[in-house]
Amino acid sequence: MKPDRGMRGNMSQAELMMMTVADVIKQLVEAHEQGKDVNLNKLKTKTSAKYGLSAQPRLVDIIAAVPPQYRKILVPKLKAKPIRTASGIAVVAVMCKPHRCPHINFTGNICVYCPGGPDSDFEYSTQSYTGYEPTSMRAIRARYDPYLQTRHRVEQLKQLGHNVDKVEFIVMGGTFMALPEDYRDFFIRNLHDALSGHTSNSVSEAVRYSERSNTKCVGITIETRPDYCLKRHLSDMLCYGCTRLEIGVQSVYEDVARDTNRGHTVKAVCESFHLSKDAGFKVVSHMMPDLPNMGLERDIEQFIEFFENPAFRPDGMKLYPTLVIRGTGLYELWKTGRYRSYSPSTLVDLVARILALVPPWTRVYRVQRDIPMPLVSSGVEHGNLRELALARMKDLGTECRDVRTREVGIQEIHHKVRPYQVELIRRDYVANGGWETFLSYEDPEQDILIGLLRLRKCSEESFRPELKGGVSIVRELHVYGSVVPISSRDPSKFQHQGFGMLLMEEAERIARDEHGSWKIAVISGVGTRNYYRKIGYELEGPYMVKRLD
């Protein structure tokens, strides 16, 4: 029924909006019962016009108004940005308070390309951020309070129709480990408390309650520098429940690291990778093509070196092409003509060639920074660089075989393909002084990845007492596909179908029969420890361990 003009005249905008939302839901239910596909944007536009509204109803309001009996059916279809939880986990990025970069003390300045920080043009921003990225703006709104940042983001994802049973934190905002210990403890304690609802007095208490929380913290990622990734830093991060490190590498060339004022050597990068992997961490590196004194050939050479040389070989990579932003040393070089960025098409070519080099055990998390385009004076001109690079790869006849491209959840969203014939595939390689085994369940015909496990035979130099004397460690276990609440089984989703258990059994066999290890350890997120307890593991220090004899 279309309301007549008289009726509309007597109604407030809020009442008309309520009727519009109810009408949209009614049409969605009818479409579902008739088995039809609906274009939500067209439906919203048409229904808003019918009620004489100038604005469309927000997706959050539509999701909130769905009746209980239709929630299971409609909410997954309405979900905004399904990629957010396609890998099986809701990622919550939080920022620590702004602080100066630690290497100012001995190099006299920050890196030449770094835009943010307390002394920069961008007030309230943290080091290496502008304050205008979505995460930065959420952090500033919450006045950098970790508890509020977490609660607000989890609520926001819930309202957008995402399942937030499993949360992974990313701690951003400069070198977290350079901050005072009491602030770091306060910050991590509040992250765990925001999920469990408990108010803790110490990190260990927060972690204990977080283990039993309904919303599980399945991992914490901390951004750091190679010189803040030493034994004491790694031990602290293990106590926090951290499972992954993002290490700023930027370049594998010593002269470029020196000229851009990084404040550490490339040797320090290799050492930090070695220590981190021997402690069980997953290592993600930040790399910056198009730095000063590079050039196209040298850029391609550095990525060949990065993936081929066993001293590097990270588990993941964030690719951040250099951006020129006002107030930086690089901006001065660019203004005086001493630095030139690649042209947009050259950059797309370069990224396409880099993605073709990525081995199947590495995950490319990002291909550009989240910095708003108006702040960029020179550098990336496209907001969808990964898509353009993948399209260029199609033209060149190459393909990207990194973990993210092949994930089952992402494949389903982008290409509507589902795995058919699933096999266990094993890849062995040497990295950072240790024997690495990458186990995965894949559909080799369609090249779709369902689950993966990273197993490492710890080297002799392992510094953790729990990992000394012939121990193997599982550094990652992840079954992809949309988030399934931890206690339920959904036959159409790939999480909780037993793939994780099969991967663990194979890892235990390799550790016992091939590595000759007497014990296997797992670096487990705080919220997933009970999963390992069920299969015979117990807590020893920060690790879940099991004897193999």
From Swiss-Prot:
Residues 398-549 form the N-acetyltransferase domain. Binds 1 [4Fe-4S] cluster. The cluster is coordinated with 3 cysteines and an exchangeable S-adenosyl-L-methionine. It is found in: Cytoplasm; Nucleus. Coiled coil: none annotated. One of its GO terms (molecular function) is metal ion binding. SMART domains: Elp3 (SM00729). Acetyl-CoA binds at residues 166, 476-479, 499-501, 532. GO terms for biological process: negative regulation of protein ubiquitination; neural crest cell migration; protein stabilization; regulation of transcription by RNA polymerase II; tRNA wobble base 5-methoxycarbonylmethyl-2-thiouridinylation; tRNA wobble uridine modification. Disruption phenotype: Morpholino knockdown results in inhibition of neural crest cell migration and reduced expression of N-cadherin. Its EC number is 2.3.1.311. SUPFAM superfamilies: Acyl-CoA N-acyltransferases (Nat) (SSF55729), Radical SAM enzymes (SSF102114). Pathway: tRNA modification; 5-methoxycarbonylmethyl-2-thiouridine-tRNA biosynthesis. It catalyses: uridine(34) in tRNA + acetyl-CoA + S-adenosyl-L-methionine + H2O = 5-(carboxymethyl)uridine(34) in tRNA + 5'-deoxyadenosine + L-methionine + CoA + 2 H(+). Keywords: 4Fe-4S, Acyltransferase, Cytoplasm, Iron, Iron-sulfur, Metal-binding, Nucleus, RNA-binding, S-adenosyl-L-methionine, Transferase, tRNA processing, tRNA-binding. In the embryo, detected at the animal pole at stage 6.5. At stage 15, expressed at the anterior neural plate and its border. At late neurulation, most abundant in the cranial neural crest. At the tailbud stage, mainly expressed in the branchial arches and eyes. [4Fe-4S] cluster binds at residues 101, 111, 114. Its cofactor is [4Fe-4S] cluster. One of its GO terms (cellular component) is nucleus. It is an enzyme of class 2 (transferase). Component of the elongator complex. Interacts with transcriptional repressors snai1 and snai2; interaction with snai1 inhibits snai1 ubiquitination and promotes snai1 stability. Catalytic tRNA acetyltransferase subunit of the elongator complex which is required for multiple tRNA modifications, including mcm5U (5-methoxycarbonylmethyl uridine), mcm5s2U (5-methoxycarbonylmethyl-2-thiouridine), and ncm5U (5-carbamoylmethyl uridine). In the elongator complex, acts as a tRNA uridine(34) acetyltransferase by mediating formation of carboxymethyluridine in the wobble base at position 34 in tRNAs. Stabilizes transcriptional repressor snai1 by inhibiting its ubiquitination which promotes neural crest cell migration. Belongs to the ELP3 family. This is Elongator complex protein 3. It comes from Xenopus laevis (African clawed frog).
